[in-house]
């Protein structure tokens, strides 16, 4: 049982302000430099040049990287569930063992990307360019490859290589 005592009216605005500030999420981590295990959850990183950064085991859930440059980025074991990489350049990025469930890669460039054992369940790869990417052991359950370029992609079994001209499905 909680008892609330009457608060003098002069303290009421201060209490309301304290309650509002306590209820807002902390975004200070969004200014943290790129580093392994960085916490960029829900951060807006649209258009940033993050070429070659190490985001190993990074917390990237719900973050936005629209039109960002992440070529050669190391994102091994990162959690990017529900993140948005629309039109981002991830050429040669290493996302081995990454959690990419429901992540949106619409029109992203993932040429030569390593998505080995990545969890891509229900990911959106609409019109993405995955030329030469490695999907060995990846979970693609419910993933949308509509219009995706899959030339030379190493498929989930680690053996099959998609033929030139593969769009939407591995031929």
Where on the chain are the PLM-derived regions?
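N-terminal targeting/docking segments
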Residues: 2-3, 22
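Bacterial N-terminal signal peptides that target proteins for export
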Residues: 3-14
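Bacterial N-terminal signal peptides
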Residues: 13-23
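Tandem repeat scaffolds
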Residues: 26-171
């Amino acid at each position: 049982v909680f008892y609330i005592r009457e608060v003098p009216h002069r303290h009421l605005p201060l209490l309301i302000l304290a309650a509002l500030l306590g209820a807002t999420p902390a975004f200070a981590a969004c200014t943290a430099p790129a580093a392994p295990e960085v916490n960029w959850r829900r951060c807006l990183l649209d258009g940033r040049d993050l070429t070659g950064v190490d985001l190993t085991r990074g917390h990237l859930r719900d973050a936005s990287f629209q039109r960002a440059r992440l070529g050669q980025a190391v994102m091994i074991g990162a959690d990017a569930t529900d993140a948005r990489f629309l039109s981002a350049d991830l050429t040669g990025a290493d996302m081995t063992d990454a959690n990419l469930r429901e992540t949106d890669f619409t029109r992203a460039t993932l040429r030569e990307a390593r998505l080995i054992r990545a969890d891509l369940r229900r990911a959106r790869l609409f019109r993405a360019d995955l030329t030469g990417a490695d999907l060995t052991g990846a979970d693609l359950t419910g993933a949308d490859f509509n219009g995706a370029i899959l030339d030379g992609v190493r498929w989930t079994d680690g053996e099959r290589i998609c033929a030139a001209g593969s769009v939407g499905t591995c031929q």
